[in-house]
Every structure is written in C-alpha cells, then in structure tokens.
Curated annotation (Swiss-Prot):
Similarity field: Belongs to the ATP:guanido phosphotransferase family.
Protein name (database record): Protein-arginine kinase
Keywords: Allosteric enzyme, ATP-binding, Kinase, Nucleotide-binding, Transferase
Annotated organism of origin: Bacillus pumilus (strain SAFR-032)
GO biological process: phosphocreatine biosynthetic process
Activity regulation (UniProt): Appears to be allosterically activated by the binding of pArg-containing polypeptides to the pArg-binding pocket localized in the C-terminal domain of McsB.
GO molecular function annotations of the record: ATP binding; creatine kinase activity; protein kinase activity
Domain Phosphagen kinase C-terminal, chain residue ranges per copy: 24-254
Keyword Secreted assigned: no
Enzyme Commission code(s) on record: 2.7.14.1
Superkingdom of origin: Bacteria
Known catalytic reactions: L-arginyl-[protein] + ATP = N(omega)-phospho-L-arginyl-[protein] + ADP + H(+)
PANTHER family in the cross-refs: ARGININE KINASE 1-RELATED (PTHR11547:SF38), ARGININE OR CREATINE KINASE (PTHR11547)
C-alpha cells in the first residue's frame, strides 16, 4: 500500500458510511498528544533526534497490523510532493503544520480512519475520525492505538501534570475532542452570533473546517475542547457530547422554523444554489462551499430529491485546490482551477442524478 492509495479518492472509507445524526454532525474526531521520554520536544529537538523518532516508528509500527483496524503505512513528509501533502490536509488526514514539517511523518491506517502524526507540534499525535456523532467510539479507537504504541515506547508523563506536551493547553490528558457540524439554519438566522460566545464560556472553542485559524466556510463549524488539565478524558468527551446534542436540537428547530416561516425563500435559495452548481462554467471554492451548504440543507429537508449527501461530501473534498490539481494531473492557475472545479461539479451532479433516475436536463 503506497501514498497513491491515500490521495487517489476524495472520500476516505470512513466518510462513505453514514453515522448517527450525520445530517448535522459530519464527523467526530479524537486527537491524543503524546511525547517520548528523554527526547526534546519538536520545537527544540535536532535534525538527528527528529530522524531518530521517524526511524523508531518505521521499525516498530510501519506495516504492522492492529486488531479491527488493519495495517499502517508510514509516509514521510520530506519524500512527499507538496501537492500530495495538500491533498492529505484537505482530506483531514494530516494537519497543515505537519505538511510544513521537514522531518514530519504519518502512520496511516488503510481505511484512513486513524492517522498517527509524527514530529508535528508533539512527537506523536494520534487522530481518530468517525462519521457522524460518535465521540465515544472515536475515543475507544484512539485509546486502543495509544495502548498499542505505549507497549513499545515510553511517554513523557508526570504524576502531577499528566502527559507532557509542547503546548501548555494540551498538558494533562493531551486530548482534543471535536465534532464537525453543518449548521446552516443557525447561521442563516444569525443565532450563531449568540451561540459561539456561549460555547466559549463553557470552555469549548469554535473554529473553521481546517481547525485553528481557519474560516467557517459553507456553514461548517468545528467545536472542540480547549483545556485538557484537571479533567478526565471521559469528562471532556461528555461535556462536548452534551453541547453537541444541544446544538443538534437547536439546528433541527431552526430548520423547521425556517421552512415553516420562509418556505418559498428557502426553496428559492436551495434551487438557486443547485442551479449555479449544475450550470456554472467557473466557480471559486468559497462560492462552491456556500452552494454545497444550501443544497445539503435542501436534501436534508426533502426539498431536493435524487441526490445524496455523500456526493456533497465528495465534492467538498474534490473541489479543494489541492485535490483539483491532483485530479487534473498537475498544477493549475487560479482561473484554471475555477474552470476545472465547475466542470467536475457538473459532471458529478449529472452522473448522480442519472444514477438515481432524476436526470435534470439543465445540468
């Protein structure tokens, strides 16, 4: 299994499955930050130490099989082309920080559900991604990988402070739990302006689709815990579960109210966006995200028939700059990307509608 396996398809295997509450919660993620004992943190270590960490993981963990998960493949960042790294970021398999790391690496599971990032901000960052609202299952998988790694390496751990990490906000459990949520009705009714500060007061943080510093395009928000010290992993996940459940309820209520009070306006918005996606000859990524959000809402409310949310999940990744260029076989100028993006969207929508016997002659 090679790098090509991970960059050839827009959708990871786990993304093709429908999880609980998947019309609102797109994915659940658990990330565990760990460091090796007696090795300086990545912010301070030498090139030799960085390479030693990668070599250790290649010898002990690459090509190894884990029960119920499968084999892992090691990908070294310095051996990976910039375009391929960008695709891995767009698929959420690695972080933007890791992509920029000269001595970074990543152990990826065959189904792309689990990635173990090496020499990012910490020596080890275990990430588990599950479809829908499945934080408990993601935590269980992350702990399984954590135990597997700890059988063969010693972690930097303090009885007083817990797991030691480069960033003080990760000290303690080292856990970052997050959900990716599609909240168009709360955004359209401007309730997110009130909700975000309330979430922050609970010790949680709201970010965009690619985490810290990213914008919430396409009405997709990432909700995660902020502090990891003084709480157990279970308490942190329970807190996020509680807030997520409330957001699901509020989004459902807002969708219902919006459809009841502004049915024609909402249908117009949904079909107008479908019309743009079906007929555009050039389209930027931000407009694509906005239109995909509208169409997803239309599918979830039963306004649009003959399209599945899976095709939208695929288009979300497929129309990103990195994957577009990977799909096209090389680098593209911005206007060339906009033309290619429009062509791919039209092609995929026509294919999906035809497959479901709902051919739209305008596409």
């Amino acid at each position: 299994m090679s790098l090509q396996h991970f960059i050839q398809d827009a959708l990871s295997q786990w993304m093709k499955q429908k999880g609980p509450e998947s019309d609102i919660v797109l994915s659940s993620r658990i990330r565990l930050a760990r460091n090796l004992e007696h090795v300086r943190f990545p912010t301070q270590f030498s090139q030799e130490e960085a390479q030693a960490v990668l070599q250790q993981f290649e010898q002990k963990f690459a090509s190894q099989e884990v029960k119920d998960i499968g084999n892992f493949v090691l990908i070294r960042m310095n051996e990976t082309q910039p375009l391929a790294k960008r695709v891995l970021v767009e698929k959420h398999l690695i972080s933007p920080n890791l992509a920029e790391s000269r001595f970074g690496g990543c152990l990826l599971s065959e189904n792309e559900e689990i990635s173990v990032m090496l020499n990012e901000e910490d020596h080890i960052r275990i990430q588990c991604l599950f479809p829908g609202f499945q934080l408990a299952n993601a935590l269980k998988a992350a702990n399984q990988i954590d135990d597997w790694i700890e059988e063969q390496v010693d972690y930097a751990f303090s009885e007083k402070r817990g797991y030691l990490t480069s960033c003080p906000t990760n000290v303690g459990t080292g856990i970052r739990a997050s959900v990716m949520m599609h909240l168009p009705a709360l955004a359209l009714t401007r309730q997110m302006n009130r909700i975000i500060p309330a979430i922050n007061q609970l010790g949680l943080v709201v970010r965009g689709i690619y985490g810290e510093g990213s914008e919430a395009i396409g009405n997709i928000f990432q909700i995660s815990n902020q502090m990891t010290l003084g709480q157990s992993e279970e308490d942190i996940v329970d807190d996020l579960n509680s807030v997520t459940a409330q957001l699901i309820e509020q989004e459902r209520s807002a969708r219902k109210a919006l459809y009841q009070t502004s049915k024609i306006e909402l249908e117009d918005r949904v079909y107008r966006s479908l019309g743009i996606l079906s007929n555009c000859r050039m389209i930027e990524s931000k407009e694509t995200a906005k239109c995909l959000s509208d169409v997803r809402l239309g599918i979830d409310l039963g306004i649009i028939k003959g399209l599945s949310s899976n095709i939208l999940n695929e288009l979300m990744i497929l129309t990103q700059p990195g994957f577009l260029q990977q799909y096209s076989g090389g680098a593209l100028e911005p206007n060339e990307r906009d033309i290619k993006r429009a062509a791919i969207i039209r092609e995929r929508l026509r294919l999906e509608m035809h497959r479901n016997g709902q051919e739209d002659e305008t596409i």
